[in-house]
Amino acid sequence: MSLVCFGEALIDFLSDGKQPESFTKYAGGAPANVAVAAAKLGLNTSFCGMLGDDMFGHFIKDELDQHSVNTSYCRFTDAAKTALAFVSLDESGERSFSFYRPPAADLLYSVDDFDHAMFANHAIMHVCSNSLTEHNIYQTTIYGLTQAKKAGAICSFDMNLRENLWPSMRHTLDRMWHVISLADIVKLSFEELEFLNQKSHQEMPLEHTIDAILKAGVTCLLVTNGGEAISFYHADFKGQVSPPATKVVDTTAAGDAFIGGMLSKIGQHCENKQSFKAFCQTPANIEQTIAYAAKAGAFAVSRYGAFASLPSAADLAEEC
């Protein structure tokens, strides 16, 4: 199987935490991170998105190329610059962000920019919610997912909510639920599950929102909770997997490493959506996939940066 990740690629300027403070440039952006994570673990992977025709956009493309990610679906524009994120870390490695977006190049990818061969050539399509923040890129994302679904692809969605990237939260829920209705795999943090539950179902138990996600057609829902157990939900069963203990220095790409690990493992075991659904009928298959993904996430948080912190298959084999 092969994977295409659609959405934003940006520059993370990571603080050194010293005084006077300085920042180091890293290629990043959640979908781009997932593409690199999966490629480093051996999956045939592409990135699809709009980059600024500037020094940062070309730096990102070069970084993707160097990590064996196919960039033939990338486009460049001079109508906006590549997005920037300044990232500060606290003592536990947790992040705080200051974004220079919008305007940004990634928001300008349109339906006409898609190479439709992409939908026929990739068995998994992955997106995040940062490509839902404005109307045009939301419409493009929905179009891409719809075309992928028509082609029989597995659709993966990581909510990865960044409220400060939304001009208004007025449309957030409707857009999230629209993507969930197209997804086969959904990954949320516990805080994101609480957000969905509070905004959608108010005082109802969290299980109400979990049931709604599964009834929307999602095959596998994953809920992470920092270093706590990872919960998974299927229409017929649920379970938990404990992640490995690790020293956290930077959580920048933790969730993306997790998703990349999960999708790479699915790509190894499944040939198409039908075999994916059959694979997910066995709890042990999901548990083993999550355990592998959790190892990838644990590796990433023990190192700085995004692409640079993502493990190879050999790295994870050494961790065993």
Descriptions of predicted regions:
Residues 1-70:
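Glycine-rich phosphate/adenosyl-contacting loop at the front of the ribokinase-like
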